């Protein structure tokens, strides 16, 4: 029977049961070489190492941090909502213009983090310009941002923009103002 028998898959194709020698062609009178007949040591294949680029690993780490940051922002949002419910309504009188408290500034910042994932110095400076007439609101804004910078884990701060990392290591703004007030009044 020839190796090019007719089969069901196609008349011109060789039969799948026919085994073809690999490598060299077989010649008449020559014995087909098996792995046991080969002389010399077996050829070794080089083991291919899986290489992950530093850029890829960095991207994966950033993605993991972004997921953790989103989780932290959700937790902060829940906490801020709870704090807002606990805030007493007597603090704001009817005749007084509505001012932002520390909690309200934190709620605003957390919402901005959730939506745009960034808190920048330019946004902070704009908010300071709006609250400039009221010393108390300005202080509340600075305190809220400082608290937020210290609530978010340090390794994730770089993903939030340039505002929170710059506030992380600094002291509490109220303490700085009190120290400045004492030095100017003396």
Swiss-Prot record:
Instruction: Extract the ranges annotated as region (Disordered).
Output: 1-45
Q: Name one Pfam family in it.
A: Paramyxo_NS_C
Cellular localization per UniProt:
Host nucleus; Host cytoplasmic vesicle
An example Gene Ontology cellular component term from the record? Answer: host cell nucleus
Give the matching InterPro entries: Paramyxovir_NSC
Q: Where is the composition biased (Polar residues)?
A: 1-12
Which pairs are disulfide-linked?
none
Q: Which UniProt keywords apply?
A: Host cytoplasmic vesicle, Host nucleus
Chief subcellular location equals host cell
Family to which the UniProt record says this protein belongs: Belongs to the morbillivirus protein C family.
What's the subunit arrangement here? Interacts with the phosphoprotein (via C-terminus); this interaction allows C to associate with the ribonucleocapsid.
Function statement? Ribonucleocapsid-associated protein that interacts with the phosphoprotein (P), thereby increasing replication accuracy and processivity of the polymerase complex.
Q: What is this protein called?
A: Protein C
